[in-house]
Amino acid sequence: MGAPGLETRAGGPNGKSYLLLASVGAAVLGTLLLSVPITVLTVLALMPQEQGGQVADPSGPGGQLLQQLGFHKLPVESRSDLSPIPPAAHLIGIAKSSHGLRWVSGYEEAFLKSGTQFLGDEGLLALPQDGIYFLYCHIGYRGRAPSGGEQFRSQAGDPGVPVTLSSQLFRARGASGSGEPELLLQGFETVTPPVQHARGVGQGPLWYATVGFGGLVQLRGGEKIYVNVSHLELVDFRRGKTFFGAVMVG
């Protein structure tokens, strides 16, 4: 009697419903498993391929489908959009005969960039573009204190008077076209070299000083700048001591 009861349950309406639901669920799951990879492969096949630096036209069928699916081509920055090196110059001072100073543009760390020109015979630095420039100047000085029994004499001839060292940066012929140079930046330093009071003979101790400055100046293209330096006989020409330059910053 127990066996027929089991057969009645399996073959009844409820058993058939369970079998039907299981079959439908398996069919739906199989369809989903097959459709997902097929969709992915289709999208990959329709994506624009880069060939020889050229990207497929997004207006074509593949590009339109990608846009509908949410894919958008990002803009590519061209090399022409990159800013060029701004005008810049760095000049180095070297010794000239008979206590002179000469600026050079092709020595050690000196350089000229992006259209800047240096007129060596006149000592003028020409700037090619309108803009705001950072101008700077650094002059090193050194000397030797008088030996015992001597008195230090300033360049004016007064014994024992401190020396005021100075350097000035000018715009040649001025911005107004008046023909007069225009002072842009300047720096000063007053030094009193030590006097050696020892009784022995020989040279006194060395002393060192620096006059440096920098600032922002608005210049027009083609304008020229130059530097005036005092006490040329005391200028320090060792590496990294005496230089001036300009770089456009805006």
From Swiss-Prot:
Keyword Kinase: no
SMART domains recorded: TNF (SM00207)
Spans traversing the lipid bilayer: 27-47
GO BP term, pick one: immune response
Subcellular location: Membrane
Gene Ontology molecular function, alphabetical: cytokine activity; tumor necrosis factor receptor binding
Membrane topology: Single-pass type II membrane protein
GO annotation, cellular component aspect: extracellular space; membrane
Spans within the Cytoplasmic topological domain: 1-26
Coiled-coil ranges from the UniProt annotation: none
Superkingdom of the organism of origin: Eukaryota
Extracellular domain ranges by topology: 48-250
Positions of glycan attachment: 228
Domain (THD): residue spans on this chain: 87-249
The entry's keywords: Cytokine, Glycoprotein, Membrane, Signal-anchor, Transmembrane, Transmembrane helix
Subunit structure: Heterotrimer of either two LTB and one LTA subunits or (less prevalent) two LTA and one LTB subunits.
Its biological purpose: Cytokine that binds to LTBR/TNFRSF3. May play a specific role in immune response regulation. Provides the membrane anchor for the attachment of the heterotrimeric complex to the cell surface.
Family the entry assigns: Belongs to the tumor necrosis factor family.
Descriptive protein name: Lymphotoxin-beta
Native organism taxonomy: Eukaryota, Metazoa, Chordata, Craniata, Vertebrata
Gene: LTB
